[in-house]
Amino acid sequence: MGLQFGFSAVQSGKRVMQSSNEPTLTANSTKAKFSLTGAVTRIMGLVPGDTVQFISNVADIDAAIAERDAEVVAWCEANNVEFGTEAARAALIQTFGEYGICKGVPLFEKDGKVKLVGVRMTAEQKAAAFELNKEKIAEELGKSVEEITIDDYIPVTRAYSGARTSTSSNLNGVGLPLTFSDSSMWNELKENLGEDAEKINRVFEVKLNEPFSVAVETGRVIGDEKETVEVSVYKIVFQSDEEPSVRQSAK
């Protein structure tokens, strides 16, 4: 039986951690945290502050279940799982589920306006940014500089799909190890670990030599069509479950 499911945007033995030169994505023991090695960020062209988006075929699997696809029903019968149950869905995803990652794309409102999101800042960072941008803020609000206060300042930036990356170093540029947070995908990719999810680093190999294209929605609607852009996706494949080092497990 040749069940296949298309990708769309989303969302074993233990050993010591492998070299960071390997192209890997790690779902860390720290809840929601992911790590990318420099080998991956270099090929994907990621710098700190860029976003990473997960791509999967789970939506297509769910659609096939909802439509009672004949091949899916037959697979469940052949594998002694009751179609329509959570156990059947979990078995289908475990068998046929595939995941990948891509660089996030700029997002728009339905009418084509650039989508903006709030910027997280400490009180000190916000105060400093307010002082530097007083004139621009006043102009945007149609007030004088003397009239505005820091409460008038709501820092925003352009929205991108996916989760924003960061680095623990002061370096910048392509090829750095990066981290990001995605609680939904962390839970999904570590679901079968149960209570051990926060005790294990789950490592995935990133197939850098086998990129493929997937259409990702931008949020803009043109006529009756949702705008999409083609992105390069790199498939991730389970490699190992590993015990975190003392430094990695510190929270």
Regions found by a protein language model. Name each.
Residues 72-79:
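Disulfide-bonded cysteine-rich modules in secreted/extracellular proteins
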Residues 81-85:
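Charged, low-complexity interaction regions
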Residues 177:
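Active-site scaffold segments
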Residues 219-226:
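Short proline/glycine-enriched turn/loop segments at secondary-structure junctions
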Residues 1-30, 43-67, 90-174, 182, ...:
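Long, compositionally biased stretches
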